[in-house]
């Protein structure tokens, strides 16, 4: 592969259900299509007896192999097994999830006949690797650097885990950026030609599994996030689930059979529901038709748009809570919002547009000029160009001012949360505060770092990590001075340090030792595993190519001999020699489908050794090309390299 050492930096939208990749090229963003010609790729990984499939190939076989096809890794990443949302999701997933060390959820599949356990980070890293390969195929060079997006409302552990997934996939994640902020860049560049002055823009991002709302002020290339809100567990999949449950009950009512115990039937129903949901965005009614859904029973039904809306009405209304919270936090009235930008496939649902905008924003026109599926990857690609210094002046002048979505603080006496960094503070940021001891001659203090909005009690918030500052000299309470510093970097990841001013004793923690966080050693091991899987995939590809070459050569040779123009020029002995060799090769192929590469190659050499000299002799006998009409299937003349050649069709 030709190309510069490291190739350009790419932007990846790592989605719950679909992912998308873009790159800055020729002064614009190019959203890159995969090998199937699709500009978005399913975030699915399938494991079979022989291979690992990622993307479209994995999703296409999901009904045949539901328990070993993993999706929704984004709903697991950075969460604990005991999380209520994880427990709810597990009821709907066909694959198995078990608790690992530190309450970390582990996905269990059977791969090549062995039971394997994967962390959500590993599954996400496989999807990232696929997106990286899609970009490399397009660019013709290796790609090392990427900007990866996360929901704005992702907490610290979810961001860290996403960064780890990037490391496992072999990418250098230059920056983690928020999805609505990335979409705002796409909107800003799209609108730049037409607008002047300050604009307040609300990004409404409803995807397959997550929901974000961000309010930004855009002026002269400065994108300042004023507030952000959301729900990391609300999206298109939840609408699908409602429809699946609706039809499960209908099937039970009509046929007195319960399909919930059958993963394959449920998967086929879910696929049909996903398709129906999309159809209902443009028509008022659609049908579901599934042959032999369960125990030989065909299932035919219809659903109207009104019924679909009724099934999901509470969820659609739920979308408005973060919008109101976002406006409150930004201290803005909805009348001051200039543009509402819809992002994410689920915003195509007419009722979402109506509830969200027409009702709430009093019939305001929605901005639909940017592609809801691609806007996030577009913005990530622009940010990647900025960070690697590749874009033109149009993008190099952009400045992104993002915010932290949740308040950060520590626990003080009585289990109270003392906030150092309130939510919606622009990042990067650094905040210091002086604390002291609670009792006389206290030998040390325990610093417990929390994120969340419950000021009264830390136990209702999320504990990010804790550390001790010990060896404080004996002193009356409130005398020692302990400076605590919270420092958030541009990825939204937190460092906390504490220092005893009298002794100079220091201690610090990067909030990465979250209970479920992977250790450095585990990440290293996963990187090696990922390389091993990649090598196995390559090996399989070579095997398939070698097998196909032999098969193509054998069948071509058979057709060549059958062709009267050529067959008539061969002696019956030679003809029989070729036919026997070809028959023997084809029957060997049928019983050795899983042979090794060198076995296929040896067989190929053996077959060529018999056929090529005979064909070459025939051509020479015919005086070069005289009198032998060349046929498409006819092999070219020449020494041992003669014989039909086949070109791989991409």
UniProtKB/Swiss-Prot annotation:
<dbReference type="InterPro" id="IPR018181">
    <property type="entry name" value="Heat_shock_70_CS"/>
</dbReference>
<dbReference type="GO" id="GO:0044183">
    <property type="term" value="F:protein folding chaperone"/>
</dbReference>
<keyword id="KW-0067">ATP-binding</keyword>
<dbReference type="GO" id="GO:0051085">
    <property type="term" value="P:chaperone cofactor-dependent protein refolding"/>
</dbReference>
<protein>
    <recommendedName>
        <fullName>Heat shock cognate 70 kDa protein 1</fullName>
    </recommendedName>
</protein>
<comment type="similarity">
    <text>Belongs to the heat shock protein 70 family.</text>
</comment>
<dbReference type="Pfam" id="PF00012">
    <property type="entry name" value="HSP70"/>
</dbReference>
<dbReference type="InterPro" id="IPR029048">
    <property type="entry name" value="HSP70_C_sf"/>
</dbReference>
<dbReference type="GO" id="GO:0042026">
    <property type="term" value="P:protein refolding"/>
</dbReference>
<dbReference type="GO" id="GO:0140662">
    <property type="term" value="F:ATP-dependent protein folding chaperone"/>
</dbReference>
<dbReference type="GO" id="GO:0005737">
    <property type="term" value="C:cytoplasm"/>
</dbReference>
<dbReference type="GO" id="GO:0031072">
    <property type="term" value="F:heat shock protein binding"/>
</dbReference>
<dbReference type="InterPro" id="IPR013126">
    <property type="entry name" value="Hsp_70_fam"/>
</dbReference>
<feature type="region of interest" description="Disordered">
    <location>
        <begin position="621"/>
        <end position="650"/>
    </location>
</feature>
<dbReference type="InterPro" id="IPR029047">
    <property type="entry name" value="HSP70_peptide-bd_sf"/>
</dbReference>
<dbReference type="InterPro" id="IPR043129">
    <property type="entry name" value="ATPase_NBD"/>
</dbReference>
<dbReference type="GO" id="GO:0016887">
    <property type="term" value="F:ATP hydrolysis activity"/>
</dbReference>
<dbReference type="GO" id="GO:0005524">
    <property type="term" value="F:ATP binding"/>
</dbReference>
<keyword id="KW-0346">Stress response</keyword>
<keyword id="KW-0547">Nucleotide-binding</keyword>
């Amino acid at each position: 592969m030709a190309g510069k050492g490291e190739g350009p930096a790419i932007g990846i939208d790592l989605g719950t259900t679909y992912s998308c990749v873009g790159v800055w090229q020729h002064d614009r963003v190019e959203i890159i299509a995969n090998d199937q010609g699709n500009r978005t790729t399913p975030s699915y990984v399938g494991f079979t007896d022989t291979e690992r499939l990622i993307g479209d190939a994995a999703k296409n076989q999901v009904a045949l192999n539901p328990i070993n096809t993993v999706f929704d890794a984004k709903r697991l990443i950075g969460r604990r097994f005991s999380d209520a949302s994880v427990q709810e999701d597990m009821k709907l997933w066909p694959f198995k999830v078990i608790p690992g060390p530190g309450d970390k959820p582990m996905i269990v599949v059977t791969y090549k006949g062995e039971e394997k356990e994967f962390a959500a980070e590993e599954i996400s890293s496989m999807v990232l690797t696929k997106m990286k390969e899609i970009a490399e195929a397009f660019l013709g060079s290796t790609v090392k650097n990427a900007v990866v997006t996360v929901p704005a409302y992702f907490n610290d552990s979810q961001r860290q885990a996403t960064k780890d997934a990037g490391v496992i996939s072999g990418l250098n994640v230059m920056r983690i950026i928020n999805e609505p902020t990335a979409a705002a860049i796409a909107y800003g560049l799209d609108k730049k030609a037409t607008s002047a002055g300050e604009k307040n823009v609300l990004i409404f991002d409803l995807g397959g599994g997550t929901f974000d709302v961000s309010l930004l002020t855009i002026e002269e290339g400065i994108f300042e996030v004023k507030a952000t809100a959301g729900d990391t567990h609300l999206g298109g999949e939840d609408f699908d689930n409602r429809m699946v449950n609706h039809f499960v009950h209908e099937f039970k009512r009509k046929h007195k059979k319960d399909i919930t115990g059958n993963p394959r039937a449920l998967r086929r129903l879910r696929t049909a529901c996903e398709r129906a949901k999309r159809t209902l965005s443009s028509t008022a009614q659609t049908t579901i038709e599934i042959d032999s859904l369960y125990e030989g029973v065909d299932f035919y039904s219809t659903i109207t748009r009104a019924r679909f809306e009724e099934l999901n009405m509470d969820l659609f209304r739920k979308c408005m809570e973060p919008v109101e919270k976002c406006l409150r936090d930004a201290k803005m009235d909805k009348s001051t919002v200039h543009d509402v930008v819809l992002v994410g496939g689920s915003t195509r649902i007419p009722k979402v547009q109506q509830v969200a905008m027409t009702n709430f924003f009093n019939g305001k026109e929605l901005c639909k000029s940017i592609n809801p599926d691609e806007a996030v990857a577009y913005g990530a690609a622009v940010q990647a160009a900025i960070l690697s210094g590749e874009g033109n002046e149009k993008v190099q002048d952009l400045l992104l001012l993002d915010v932290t979505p949740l308040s950060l603080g520590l626990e003080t006496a009585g289990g109270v949360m003392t906030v150092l960094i309130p939510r919606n503070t622009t990042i990067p940021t650094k905040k210091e505060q002086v604390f002291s001891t609670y009792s006389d001659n206290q030998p040390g203090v325990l610093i417990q770092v929390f994120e969340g909005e419950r000021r009264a009690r830390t136990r209702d918030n999320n504990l990010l990590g804790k550390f001790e500052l010990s060896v404080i000299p004996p002193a009356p309470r409130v005398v020692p001075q302990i400076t605590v510093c919270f420092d958030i970097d541009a990825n939204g990841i937190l460092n906390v340090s504490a220092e005893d001013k009298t002794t100079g004793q220091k201690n610090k923690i990067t909030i990465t030792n979250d209970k479920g966080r992977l250790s450095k050693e585990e990440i290293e091991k996963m990187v090696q595993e990922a390389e091993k899987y990649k090598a196995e995939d390559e090996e399989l590809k070579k095997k398939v190519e070698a097998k196909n070459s032999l098969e193509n050569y054998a069948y071509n040779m058979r057709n060549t001999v059958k062709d009267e123009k050529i067959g008539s020029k061969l002696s019956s002995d030679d003809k029989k020699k070729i036919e026997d060799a070809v028959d023997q090769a084809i029957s060997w192929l049928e019983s050795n489908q899983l042979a090794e590469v060198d076995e296929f190659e040896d067989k190929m050499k053996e077959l060529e050794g018999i056929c090529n000299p005979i064909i070459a002799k025939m051509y020479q006998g015919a005086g070069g090309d005289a009198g032998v009409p060349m046929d498409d299937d006819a092999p070219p003349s020449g020494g041992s390299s003669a014989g039909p050649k086949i070109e791989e069709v991409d």
